[in-house]
UniProtKB/Swiss-Prot annotation:
Compartmental location: Cytoplasm
EC nos: 5.1.3.32
Protein name: L-rhamnose mutarotase
Pathway(s) of this molecule: Carbohydrate metabolism; L-rhamnose metabolism
Cited Pfam families: rhaM
Subunit structure: Homodimer.
Species annotation: Escherichia coli O1:K1 / APEC
InterPro entries: Dimeric_a/b-barrel, L-rhamnose_mutarotase, Rham/fucose_mutarotase
A single Gene Ontology CC term: cytoplasm
Residues that coordinate or bind substrate: Y18, Y41, W76, W77
Keywords annotated in UniProt: Carbohydrate metabolism, Cytoplasm, Isomerase, Rhamnose metabolism
Catalytic activity: alpha-L-rhamnose = beta-L-rhamnose
One of the GO biological process terms: rhamnose catabolic process
Enzyme kind, highest EC tier: isomerase
Amino acid sequence: MIRKAFVMQVNPDAHEEYQRRHNPIWPELEAVLKSHGAHNYAIYLDKAHNLLFATVEIESEERWNAVASTDVCQRWWKYMTDVMPANADNSPVSSELQEVFYLP
């Protein structure tokens, strides 16, 4: 498995709405993530800084990257644009993090 971590932002007034939309996520989005090899996906909220820290284990970069081109992912991104900063393609503004320590 490949471990990934990334940081996103959430609008200051949208913490509760962001959480509501993820509890649960759409069943079809969950199915796409799983069918593309995503495991143990978690998102954490830092309310003080309006940051979201996400971790996910993936089977391959290729399969993970393919999620973005699915219809359900495109719809999800559009759905989330009012609660978080987004790029021109509606994907969330994010920064990938470099792993510096891991204790198996």
